[in-house]
Structures are given as C-alpha cells and as structure tokens.
Amino acid sequence: MKRKPFNVGPVTLRSMPFWCVGNPLADPFGSKVLESIPSVQTAEIICESANEGLIEATSFHDDDLVPWNPENLEDDLEKNSDTMQTLCEIKEMLNSAGVSVNTATCSLHGNPIFRNGGVTNPDPKIREIARKKVERTIRIGNFLGAKYFTYWVARDGFEVPVAVDWENVYKWLADGLNSVYDYIKRKKFTNYIGGTIEPKPNEPRGHMFIPTSGHAVGFILGKLKNPNFWGVYPELLQHESMALMNAVHTLGYLISMNKLSFLHFGSQIKAQFDNDFPPLIGPEGLKETVQMFWLLEKLGWKGVVEFDCHMLRCEANPKEPIQSRKIFIKNCVTALSICLELSSRIKKVNNVEKITESEIDLSAIMKMCAVDEKKIASCSVNS
C-alpha cells in the first residue's frame, strides 16, 4: 500500500518516529512514567495513526527497533535471528499501512560503551565498534526503505577542552561520516537519497562538536568528500533555541545553502535544557514557530516535517499507556495544522505598504490572529 502524501503548504509528509511514541518519559530526576512497550507495539500505534489519516511516515534509531549486542555486530544478517524476525514483522506492518520510513539513525548515545563518544571516541577500538553499529543501522534502514541516514551528535562532544585531541577529533568525525557514504555505495543501496546531520549545542555532553546548523554546513562543505550527499535537519524550536538563535534565521540560511533536508519539529523555552515539548506547547514560541512555516512557503521549500518531542511527563497516564501515546500523536498533528493555518494568513502581508519594520510586524500579528486592522486602528485613537 502506498499512502497519499499530505501536501499541505510546504509539508509533503508528516513523520512520527518510533522514539517519540515509545518514550516512557523517564528523566534525570525520576523513573519512567509509562511502561515501556516493545517495538512491534510501537509500530502498531504508528500504523493506527496513519490509518486515521494523522501521519504518513516514521523514523527510527536502531535501538528503538531491536536490541544491540556489541558481541554480535551482524545479527541482522542472520535470517532466523530474533532481530531479523522483529524487523520483518515491523516491515510488514508499515508496508500494510503505507507508512514510509524517512530516516534511519544509529544510536551512539544509549550504551555506556559510547560514554566518551562514538565516531569521535579517542579509543580507536570504540570508533571501530561505532562504525560497525552504523553499518548495521544502514542495513536496517535499507531493509525498511529509509530515505536518509542521519547522524545526530549524540555523545560526540566534551566537557574539558584541554582533554580533547583537537588535532584529530574532526578528522575522526569526517572519517566516520565519509564511511557512511562509502558503505552505502559499496553495498549499492538505492533507497538512500542522502545523509543528514542534526546539530545540537549541548546535552548530553557539555559541548557538542557540531553545535549549530552553521557548524554543520561548514563541516559538510569543508571536511566531507561528498558534500552533495549531505544535508542538515535542524530541530526547531529546540536545539537552536537552546543557543538563543532564531528558527526562521536557521531555515533561511539552510535553504540559501541548499542544505535543508527535512525538519525536526517541537517546542522549547529559550536557553533551557532540551525541553522537547510537543509543537506549540509551553509558554513561548508561537510567533517564531508560525513564521517558520511562513518562510518555508515564501521560499518555495517543500519536504518532510518530522516530530521530535515527547508528551509532557505530567500528562502521561500510567493506567492508559497506549491511549496516552495516541493522544500525544493527535496533539502533535493538531499543532502542525494550526501552524500551517496561521502561517497561511500572514503570507499576504505587503511590506511595501508599511513604513517601519514594527508596523510590518504588527500587521503580520494581526493577520495571524485574524484581527480586524481597521477596528484596532479605531480603538487606538482617543476621540
């Protein structure tokens, strides 16, 4: 089955990843709120949401789908292994529901073996294990038909600057990402249309080696041997807001460089830890979020919007772990539809008619909120 694209405004597909749906909502201060569910059950929830017309795609970390054993790095190649049986079941479910796979991501953050980094680990033996895990993820992505292989910075970062091997760390990172391209070409995997990088300023490490979208583009163009293969997927509002940057600026820059692959979507309080709030949820960010979609429409960009967030920990119901997850998906989709509707209202703002930038901004706000500008003008004059 092939599902009809969403194709509303700049959004071609709505993707809800396994890690968002399966999240049991543990945090550094407390244990999980919801019971963990197996990946097949997560796939079932995703497929049900697709059948309800809420989403068209999904994504995964390798560890979201199947366990990883560093003593058996090629279990996915064993036809009768538990790993392959689980992957076959998930593939059949996704195909039956017409859910495409946007991206395959290798988890290089969960296992303590990667506590000092994955592809940038100073220990060459750990870097080799990371490379093998990446190759396994690429194979799983090929099996499920993923369009992108993505690298997010995970634990490739530092806390102590003087402890970093600065002469080699970016070479190791380039070697790791170049090997992704080489492996895909060597295996003749045709499902992948590119690789992508997700930057993040900090967390889980104190500083990350690729902290912003600008760093990511510079690294791609300056260090990778096949820069046309690679793009960037920013997590907005979250990651850029952590560094007090503006999401509209980020998207404008990436589009100008032809490096915006797709978009990770959620909400964030600026300068805090990675909140990963659902879109539009929380005390701030409405204007910035809506203007993101205004910009995408204005510049003619079209692509996948992928949710990367989790439900608020306080609203998870331990007695209804499945229903809580379904409500979360619906809320994310509703928020996206709100953004698209509000952004469509401000695309008619005519900058030429306004004298100042403040007037342009106020006019855009009134249009976004469907406020009668003439009524506001009359109320502003004390007669």
Residue ranges of model-derived segments:
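Glycine-rich, aromatic-flanked loop segments that form ligand/cofactor-binding clefts
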Residues: 3, 9-18, 44-68, 78, ...
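Catalytic-core regions built around general acid/base machinery
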Residues: 76-98, 173-176, 180-183, 291-295
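An active-site-proximal structural segment forming one wall of the substrate-binding cleft
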Residues: 90-93, 122-149, 169-188
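Surface-exposed, active-site-proximal loop segments in enzymatic domains
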Residues: 24-31, 65-82, 110-128, 155-168, ...
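Active-site-proximal loop/turn and secondary-structure-junction residues that shape catalytic pockets
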Residues: 20-22, 62-66, 105-110, 153-157, ...
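Extended, charge-rich low-complexity interaction segments
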Residues: 100, 132-136, 299-302
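Active-site-proximal loop/short-helix segments
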Residues: 106-117, 146-168, 190-207, 211
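Histidine-acidic metal/acid-base catalytic patches
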Residues: 1-54, 73, 139, 147, ...
